Design a protein with these regions (language model features):
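Long, compositionally biased tandem-repeat segments
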Residues: 1-4, 8-236
């Protein structure tokens, strides 16, 4: 009873608040040829004594004006689970628009659990930018998925990796599509628990030829004392 009273006196804040979504940029073009970037998603709040971490907000899309690169803003990371018990929050999704040839990691990562609880799932990567004159017509690479959060130090499964974003389409029917992104890495279990599953790889963007499919993410490591590794994600 005494320990129960201590827990009650400490209070249980419940689930933490989620991070806000980043706004999309407008369509205007600045003097250097760049349109504005979308806002980044907010990080999810951490839980108190017992509770689930808040989910990360989604990243905004870039503006639609002509520019050298289109970059989708990053999704926020998930919040950490409660000190005694609680799962980590899920990561936010990345905005659409990846650098040509390079998948900028813009998906939020899942939050980790502290003592007992499962890691949060990673967010999805944003899709690649459409091909443009500045990219030689080639579609941009899809963004990788976010990593799953780690399970609790004592017990908990790793979070699943996020799905990757599809490659961007070629500028026209004779332009190559961009490569699909790589699936996110599954979260790790510490002592007891299974590793998180890897995220799914994404298909390449349409074009001539179509972009290469992205591989699935690797599964997370199982617990040191008990647990199995997570499975790899499917290829795009």
């Amino acid at each position: 009873m005494g320990s129960e009273m201590c827990i009650r006196d400490s209070g249980n804040g419940g689930a933490a608040g989620s991070g806000g979504n980043g706004g999309d940029a407008g369509t205007g073009v600045s003097s250097d040829g760049f349109a504005g970037l979308g806002g980044s998603g907010g990080r999810g709040g951490d839980a108190g004594l017992i509770g689930v971490g808040g989910g990360g907000g989604n990243g905004g899309d870039p503006g639609l004006g002509a520019r050298l690169f289109q970059v989708g803003s990053r999704g926020g990371d998930g919040g950490v689970g409660g000190w005694l018990y609680g799962d980590g929050g899920g990561g936010g999704d990345g905005g659409n628009g990846g650098l040509p040839f390079i998948g900028s990691t813009n998906a939020g990562n899942g939050g980790s659990a502290r003592l007992i609880g499962n890691g949060g799932a990673g967010g999805s990567g944003g899709g690649g930018a459409p091909g443009s004159v500045s990219s030689g017509g080639v579609g941009g690479a899809g963004n990788p998925g976010g990593s799953g959060g780690n399970g609790g130090v004592w017990y908990g499964n790793g979070g699943a990796g996020g799905a990757a974003g599809q490659g961007g389409p070629g500028m026209n029917t004779t332009s190559p599509g961009g490569p699909g992104g790589v699936g996110g890495h599954g979260g790790t279990a510490i002592l007891f628990g299974d590793g998180g599953a890897g995220g799914a790889g994404a298909a390449g963007g349409p074009g001539t030829p179509d972009g290469a499919a992205g591989p699935g993410g690797s599964g997370g490591t199982g617990g040191l004392l008990f647990g199995v590794p997570g499975p790899s994600g499917p290829d795009g």
